[in-house]
């Protein structure tokens, strides 16, 4: 059976949690393959219960699904334990959550360095969440990181943390004028935290591939979005990992030939958090409307999201770099009551029109959106369950976005609830 990748096709916050939740009851495994607690998924159950997840895969809310935090994720032990407790206190069974032995641990010195670096950068800061994600990935690439499996051996763990802090304390004390961290305290705190998750540590690569060979279906859940990818995003205003579909194989240990479908999540308009170029950003009453009606505040940071019209240049780019086979269009209901809905179909840069993503970031910063005005609709569409239930102008909007983005819009979200979804094509049934 297949492995299916679910990715954000914009700058994150597209509604990936809802998509995972919708598919979760029909898959056996849900895997988070990159990022850390710098991203959040909001899931609204049919009961009306609202869950905000930051590190744990959204499939934890579906009984019988095995959830995996993959080797590509960076794990803050304190956040993990707090999130587990929060779920368990609300009656959620977390017994089927596993953690890759090769995932990296995010430790106090990563958070400290992240925060002081942002302050030091001042107006040149990237706009990170301050959660330590970037510094943890830096250590991974520099080969001085701490892996989850290291907590199983006190001697190995102590040696690695002492070695890491030799450098980190130099940075904290001599560059940022902060107090040095005590390696012994870091080790003891981590070992105490590990008592709460050591039983979850597993060779998840082996388990996932064995499951696929047994005919089970695996859903690979990315965090953030395509335009935040460290390689393919709006660098340097990006995250420190690969949310794109290529990162799914690397961050889970599943070979790329196992992946049979890539589901891109697209919001019916566009948002982003933090600094960086955003050609369709709105600064008028329309931006205020999208922010207020769409509830555009970050799940993780609480920061207000920047809002703009749908950008088909971004959508086409996401289709290309991810190999997207299907789209899940979310928050179509937010656009109800607008007289017209502009869609960006290209950019104008220094007087010349281009229809694809600019090659350089300096060009993207200068890009002016070229809009196609589509007629809006006034009807409340939150109760629509079939495509034909939508007003004709809403259907036309979806079909035009599908044409511009270059892949089939298989699902449409018309509200936050799991049941507030129109399925035009069954993503799982359409695959081998």
UniProtKB/Swiss-Prot annotation:
Active site, UniProt feature: 13 (proton acceptor), 41 (proton donor)
Cofactor note: Binds 1 Mg(2+) ion per subunit.
Coiled-coil boundaries: none
Subcellular localization: Cytoplasm
PROSITE patterns: ADENYLOSUCCIN_SYN_1, ADENYLOSUCCIN_SYN_2
Cofactor(s) annotated in UniProt: Mg(2+)
Keywords: Cytoplasm, GTP-binding, Ligase, Magnesium, Metal-binding, Nucleotide-binding, Purine biosynthesis
Catalyzed reaction equations: IMP + L-aspartate + GTP = N(6)-(1,2-dicarboxyethyl)-AMP + GDP + phosphate + 2 H(+)
Annotated CDD domains: AdSS (cd03108)
EC number: 6.3.4.4
GO CC annotations on file: cytoplasm
Assembly notes: Homodimer.
Protein name per its UniProtKB record: Adenylosuccinate synthetase
Organism whose genome encodes this protein: Mycobacterium avium (strain 104)
Lineage: Bacteria, Bacillati, Actinomycetota, Actinomycetes, Mycobacteriales
Gene: purA
């Amino acid at each position: 059976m297949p492995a299916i990748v679910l990715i954000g096709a914009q700058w994150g916050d597209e509604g990936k949690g809802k998509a995972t939740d919708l598919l979760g009851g029909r898959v056996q495994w849900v895997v988070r393959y990159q990022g850390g607690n710098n991203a959040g998924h909001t899931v609204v159950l049919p009961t009306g219960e609202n869950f905000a997840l930051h590190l744990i895969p959204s499939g934890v809310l579906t009984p019988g699904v095995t959830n995996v935090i993959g080797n590509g994720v960076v794990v803050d032990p304190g956040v993990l334990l707090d999130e587990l407790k929060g779920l368990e206190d609300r009656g959620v069974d977390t017994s089927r959550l596993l953690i890759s032995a090769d995932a990296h641990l995010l430790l106090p010195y990563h958070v400290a360095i992240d925060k002081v670096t942002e302050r030091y950068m001042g107006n040149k800061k990237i706009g990170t969440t301050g959660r330590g994600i970037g510094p943890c990935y830096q250590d991974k690439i520099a080969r001085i990181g701490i892996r989850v499996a290291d907590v199983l051996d006190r001697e190995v763990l102590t040696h690695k943390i002492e070695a890491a802090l030799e450098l980190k304390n130099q940075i904290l004390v001599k560059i940022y004028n902060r107090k040095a961290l005590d390696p012994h305290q870091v080790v003891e705190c981590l070992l105490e935290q590990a008592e709460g998750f050591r039983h979850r540590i597993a060779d998840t690569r082996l388990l996932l591939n064995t499951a696929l060979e047994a005919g089970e279906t695996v859903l690979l859940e990315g965090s953030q979005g395509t335009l935040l990818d460290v390689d393919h995003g709006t660098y340097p205003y990006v995250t420190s990992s690969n949310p794109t579909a290529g990162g799914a194989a690397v961050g889970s240990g599943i070979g790329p030939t196992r992946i049979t479908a890539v589901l891109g999540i697209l919001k019916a308009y566009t948002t982003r958090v933090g600094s960086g170029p955003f050609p369709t950003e709105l600064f008028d009453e329309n931006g205020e409307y999208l922010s207020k009606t769409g509830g555009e505040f970050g799940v993780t940071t609480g920061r207000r999201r920047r809002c703009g019209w749908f950008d088909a240049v971004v959508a086409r780019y996401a289709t290309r770099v991810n190999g997207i086979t299907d789209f899940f269009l979310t928050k179509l209901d937010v656009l109800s009551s607008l007289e017209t809905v502009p869609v960006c179909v290209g950019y104008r840069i220094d007087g010349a029109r281009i229809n694809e993503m600019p090659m350089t970031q300096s060009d993207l910063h200068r890009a002016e959106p070229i809009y196609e005005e589509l007629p809006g609709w006034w009807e409340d569409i939150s109760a629509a369950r079939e495509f034909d239930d939508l007003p004709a102008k809403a259907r036309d909007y979806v079909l035009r976005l599908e044409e511009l983005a270059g892949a089939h819009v298989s699902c449409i979200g018309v509200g936050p609830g799991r049941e507030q979804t129109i399925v035009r094509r069954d993503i799982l049934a359409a695959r081998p």
